[in-house]
């Protein structure tokens, strides 16, 4: 956004940001999603992006529950959604079992419906279709040692 001088409105809801965001024009709201009046959320339109990096734990009343059952159904067609730490069709990494993540079970159900069109999965393409990285122009991107690509991009229909 800064590099290309793109006019935008970035709202980040993160109760505990882990990294400094100095110099970025971001409206930080440090309130857990469970304490937010959903009527006050920004209205997203076609072409907007909803970037989700949640607790990854889908239990009643969790942020994942609120996102999937209340926020996503409100989105109009053409909104892009990014989920982080999604390894479909595989389970979470073995060394992550202690985290007890289950979000991707819910994401699997979303993908089975008709509201969300999968656009890109960095994990899937790197592990199941790496030949397409060159076709898409992503073969130049280096992955840091020990990191796992895990971005899933969807578009609402």
Which residues does each predicted region cover?
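S-adenosyl-L-methionine
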Residues: 3-54, 59
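C-terminal substrate-binding/active-site "lid" region of AdoMet-derived donor-dependent transferases
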Residues: 43, 56-156
């Amino acid at each position: 956004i800064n590099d290309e001088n793109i006019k935008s409105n970035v709202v980040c809801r993160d109760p505990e940001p882990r990294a400094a965001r100095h110099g970025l024009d971001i409206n930080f709201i440090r309130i857990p999603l469970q304490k937010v009046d959903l009527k006050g959320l920004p209205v997203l339109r076609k072409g907007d992006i909803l970037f989700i990096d949640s607790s990854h734990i889908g239990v009643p009343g969790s942020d994942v529950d609120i996102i999937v059952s209340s926020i996503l159904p409100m989105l109009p067609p053409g909104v892009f959604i990014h989920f982080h730490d999604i390894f479909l069709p595989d389970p979470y990494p073995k060394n992550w079992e202690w985290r007890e993540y289950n979000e991707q079970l819910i994401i699997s159900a979303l993908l089975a419906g008709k509201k969300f069109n999968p656009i890109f999965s960095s994990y899937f393409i790197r592990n199941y279709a790496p030949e397409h990285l060159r076709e898409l122009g992503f073969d130049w991107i280096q992955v840091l040692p020990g990191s796992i690509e895990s971005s899933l991009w969807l578009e609402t229909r």
